[in-house]
Regions:
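A conserved donor-nucleotide-binding helix/loop in the catalytic core
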Residues: 122-130
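Alpha-helix capping/helix-boundary segments
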Residues: 23-24, 70, 125, 140-141
Length: 164
């Protein structure tokens, strides 16, 4: 299946997208060193085909954005990288931050929304789901956003279509 033709993506063609922490970690680690997909423990649920699917999926959107909360989680997850590549990774991470658009709202504003039970990062994503498409692996987040008719795509559903 051609990703752009997916019924999951068609309604969101041309919208800006925000990746959850795990998908942003996957994208940035793959662009840094593709071998990390098979060797880095934080990415052990992914295969190289997921990187291709993610890359093709992102072409459907007008832009890629993030939040300070997602960046913090990516940074924390990446702390588990082997010591011998951390300096190079830090440089790569810094370069990526320079080119991605960052959206944020004060934590006090986010903490009042109905999604706070999912945690601050997910509540921030929910806060932005009216004007951005959230691409996530997180079932509780995607189900909560879907129930509120907000813009979300569960990457696992795309994987299933991709394999057909």
């Amino acid at each position: 299946m051609i990703v752009a033709d997916s019924p999951l993506l068609k309604p969101y063609r041309g919208w800006p997208a925000i990746l959850d922490s795990n998908l942003l970690l996957l994208q940035w680690c793959f662009s840094f060193d593709p071998s990390l997909v098979s060797s880095f423990k934080r990415l052990n649920s992914f295969q190289s085909e997921d990187c291709e699917l993610l890359s093709d999926t992102l072409k459907v959107f007008s832009s890629l954005k993030t939040t300070p909360h997602v960046l913090t989680e990516v940074s924390n997850l990446a702390n588990a990288l082997p010591r011998w590549i951390k300096d190079d990774w830090s440089e790569h991470f810094s370069r990526q931050i320079q080119v991605i658009s960052e959206e944020w709202s004060p934590a006090a504003a986010i903490a009042t929304n109905d999604f706070m039970h999912l945690g601050l990062t997910d509540a921030a994503l929910a806060h932005l789901a009216k004007t951005n498409v959230i691409l996530t692996l997180d079932f509780p987040l995607s189900n909560s956003l879907e129930s509120q008719k907000l813009k979300v795509i569960n990457f696992t559903h795309l994987r299933s279509l991709w394999l057909e």
